[in-house]
Amino acid sequence: MAKQIWKPGNMVYPLPAVMVSTGDKKGNQNILTVAWTGTVCTNPAMVYISVRPERYSYHMIEESGEFVINLTTEKLARATDFCGVRSGRDVDKWKECHLSAKKAQTLEEAPVNIECKVKKIEKLGSHHMFLAEVTAVQADEAYLNEKGKFELNKTGLLAYSHGEYLGLGKKIGTFGYSVKKKSDRRRKRGKK
């Protein structure tokens, strides 16, 4: 297989396309679409988002020290795109996209809301990374199975890659499935 050499760039794709909600001390609220996001640490639970300093939400997050990562779905694709290309300086994104906010600016329509408190801001270049501790997680009960397990694969999650939004959802394995013995797999499925 032949490969081309490209200039250095971020090729870690696909990425989650999340809607980050925040507010300032004056009561203004905004939603920002972010693809530069992920897990930093398990214990304590920490995440990050990277935002350009010129974005309207940047100073809200910097001032309040808080934000909410709202996972997006295929049903939220249009709103996710809108909140990434329109500025909260010019338009009320909540109103324009017919979105509902609950406490702490959590997006009601999102299957998962991850409430975060900023611990550190790393000024890296074009984007500044907000390192944050997770203070609460809300999960939509509609996606809980009979055992109370959250079935994220049924939410129709949205991903982003090179300017395109992609739907996710098909489960192809579970953690450790590649090394489990066949007898363990049969037992788990209820076969002997």
Where are these regions (language model features)?
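Basic, polyanion-binding surface patches
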Residues: 1-192
